[in-house]
A protein has these predicted regions:
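Conserved glycine-bearing catalytic or ligand-binding loops at nucleotide- and phosphate-handling centers
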Residues: 248-254, 258-287
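Nucleotide/pyrophosphate-binding catalytic subdomain
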Residues: 26-258
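A conserved regulatory-domain signal marking ACT and ACT-like small-molecule sensing domains
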Residues: 279-312
Length: 312
């Protein structure tokens, strides 16, 4: 599928995605290519160097297919919890069990997990002959409000990433973070890398956003609890938002909201399927679940899925 790039935006122009959120990515200077894809890999997918190498193989598959690629990564599994523990230990007042800390320093420490992963993945990709570099949130920049620890993205300037796409370079982006009005690192809260990926996909006008996890799609209910749970081929943004709000752990609620507002076609896929497995290179119908506009779903089911919370 050949991709027709839109005309360059007027200088200073930006597209509003939500009140107060501007997307500044343009397609200036690009030649036609097959597609532009944002790929996101969670903590279990990048838990160690062996798994990071597997992630790199997934990325290389898309690059070898002629696609422009940005990759958003989480911290390695367990690393964020470890960093939070360090913050709590370091901030204990002498002779007290109270943890009183500066939220800006908390963010500076906790955001480092994603920074490590992005650098490691860029190195592995380079070792495979792929032109890649790592990007921190402040370098792009991904701008946020000032709510340190639970910040919201206000705008993303994707113009430099788009320029690098035109040069054939893969952008490996540290998820979960941006830069606040105070020019300090601000983290987006738990699950924030999903939001980073969808917002980036909207900013650079990606054709698709692939969320790679340890499951191979969205199921009618938790397959670990109900063996007869069925994987859905497609689910609407509205249905996914409702399931996420009710406790489904596949995607963070905020990421689904952004995908729905900006019509970002989002696939939930497994990073543990071999990159060269049958169908993995199928652009239109890869294995997994497509989260899309309701108009793309021909037949609506009365009940799409069941979500529940274990502690209720």
């Amino acid at each position: 599928m050949e991709r027709a790039h839109p005309a360059p935006a007027e200088p200073g122009a930006s597209a509003q995605i939500l009140p107060g959120i501007a997307l500044l990515g343009t397609s200036q200077g690009l030649v036609a290519s097959m597609a532009r894809i944002v790929m996101k890999f969670g903590g279990t997918s990048v838990a160690d160097i062996a798994r990071i190498r597997n992630v790199a193989r997934h990325v290389k598959r898309e690059v070898d297919s002629g696609h422009e690629v940005a990759v958003v990564v989480s911290a390695m599994a367990g690393k964020t919890n470890e960093l939070v523990g360090w913050v709590q230990e370091a901030s204990k007042a002498e002779g007290s069990n109270l943890n009183i800390y500066d939220a800006r320093e908390y963010d500076a420490v906790v955001a480092s997990g994603e920074q490590v992963t992005s650098g490691l993945l860029a190195l592995v990709l380079q070792s495979m002959g792929v032109d890649a570099r790592s990007w921190q949130g402040w370098q792009i920049p991904v701008r946020t409000d000032n709510s340190h620890g639970a910040a919201r993205i206000t705008d993303i300037d994707g113009s430099e990433l788009v320029r690098r796409f035109g040069m054939g370079q893969v952008a490996v982006v540290a998820g979960f973070q941006g830069v606040g009005p105070d020019n300090r690192i601000a983290t987006l809260g738990r699950g924030g890398s999903d939001t980073s990926a969808v917002a980036l996909a909207a900013a650079v006008k990606a054709d698709r956003c692939d969320i790679y996890t340890d499951v191979d799609g969205v199921y009618t209910t938790d397959p670990r609890v109900e063996p007869k749970a069925r994987r859905l081929a497609k689910i609407s943004f509205e249905e996914m938002l409702e399931m996420a709000s009710l406790g489904a752990k596949v995607l963070q609620v905020r990421s689904v909201e952004l995908a729905m507002v900006h019509k970002v076609r989002t696939f939930v896929r497994s990073s543990f399927v071999e990159p060269d497995a049958p169908g993995m290179g199928d652009f239109d119908n890869p294995p997994g679940t497509l989260i899309c506009d309701e108009d793309e779903i021909v037949e609506q089911q009365v009940v799409t899925g069941i979500a529940y919370a274990k502690d209720e």
